[in-house]
């Protein structure tokens, strides 16, 4: 059984196939090909977009969704996460979608299940379906990504979204530039800067990231407003440039992106959300139906 833990679990050819399926699904062309299939969602961290879009994706393809209420599960009685997964797997689901605050959990569980494990985010490690929907959004806008430049701005060091996008967008020949204060920059061979203004005239897209305060061991800024004074994506910074704006959500208004830009047609945040359903439909098809 194939799992999706990281974007590099799929070949480039497989990703192209997923994008093609997502294009059909986004146009409303799909059948209930997962009828009689069962998918379990196992979320140990809060989620609005990812969980909802996976559930909508599964239902549109005809699958049954079972959501395990983690707060009332046997993990609260001392059952290990691996034992929980093995017991759920014994019930015969076709996929288990997992989000967990610790990096590596999805990979560990994939070693103990017959069902496909789909990583819906593990700590600061990876969020593969987010990167796939971001790629889909960018390709719909630009068609050919080769040579295009994207600035990823914000708390990159603590972002699973950044990790997955760096791998995937680089594979599709985009130049990724990292923009962040020193404490938010990971060690990387990529081009980096502390000032968005330095590269604003070069980039074709900006991906803003939320400050991951829940993953900080100590306070890094006196306040989020102090952070925003340097790294909020504002109308003044972007001006009238032909740049599209992305964000994986949730957006901190006027911290990550200003209100005016969120209402601007160049902002693709809601398009990303819509594309997330189509991409997750395509991923479910790939892992459950196309085997």
Swiss-Prot record:
Record's subunit section: Heterododecamer (2C3:3R2) of six catalytic PyrB chains organized as two trimers (C3), and six regulatory PyrI chains organized as three dimers (R2).
Functional note: Catalyzes the condensation of carbamoyl phosphate and aspartate to form carbamoyl aspartate and inorganic phosphate, the committed step in the de novo pyrimidine nucleotide biosynthesis pathway.
Gene Ontology terms: cellular component: cytosol
Primary gene name: pyrB
Family: Belongs to the aspartate/ornithine carbamoyltransferase superfamily. ATCase family.
Residues given in the record as L-aspartate binding sites: 77, 160, 210
Protein name: Aspartate carbamoyltransferase catalytic subunit
Pathway(s) this gene product operates in, as recorded in its UniProt entry: Pyrimidine metabolism; UMP biosynthesis via de novo pathway; (S)-dihydroorotate from bicarbonate: step 2/3
């Amino acid at each position: 059984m194939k799992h999706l833990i990281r974007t590099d679990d799929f070949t480039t050819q497989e990703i192209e196939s997923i994008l093609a399926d997502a294009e059909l699904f986004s146009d409303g062309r799909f059948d209930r090909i997962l009828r009689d299939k069962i998918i379990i969602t196992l979320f140990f961290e809060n989620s609005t977009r990812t969980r909802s879009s996976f559930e909508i994706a599964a239902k549109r393809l005809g699958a049954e969704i079972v959501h395990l209420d983690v707060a009332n599960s046997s993990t609260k009685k001392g059952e290990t996460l691996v034992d929980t997964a093995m017991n759920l797997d014994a019930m015969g689901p076709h996929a288990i979608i997992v989000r967990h605050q610790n990096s590596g959990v999805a990979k560990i569980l994939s070693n103990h299940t017959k069902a496909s494990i789909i990583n819906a985010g593990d700590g600061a490690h990876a969020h593969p379906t987010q990167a796939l929907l971001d790629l889909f959004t960018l390709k719909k806008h630009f068609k050919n990504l080769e040579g295009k430049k994207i600035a990823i701005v914000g708390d990159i060091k603590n972002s699973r979204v950044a990790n997955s996008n760096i791998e995937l967008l680089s594979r599709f020949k985009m130049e990724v530039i990292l923009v962040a204060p020193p404490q938010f920059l990971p060690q990387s061979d990529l081009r980096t800067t502390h000032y968005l203004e330095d590269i604003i005239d070069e980039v074709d897209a900006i991906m803003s990231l939320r400050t991951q305060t829940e993953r900080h061991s100590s306070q890094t800024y006196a306040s989020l407003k102090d952070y925003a004074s340097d790294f909020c994506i504002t109308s003044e910074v972007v001006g009238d440039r032909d740049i599209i704006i992305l964000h994986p959500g949730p957006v901190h208004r006027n911290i990550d992106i200003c209100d005016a830009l969120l209402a601007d047609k160049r902002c693709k945040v809601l398009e990303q959300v819509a594309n997330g359903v189509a991409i997750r439909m395509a991923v479910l098809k790939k892992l459950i139906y196309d085997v």
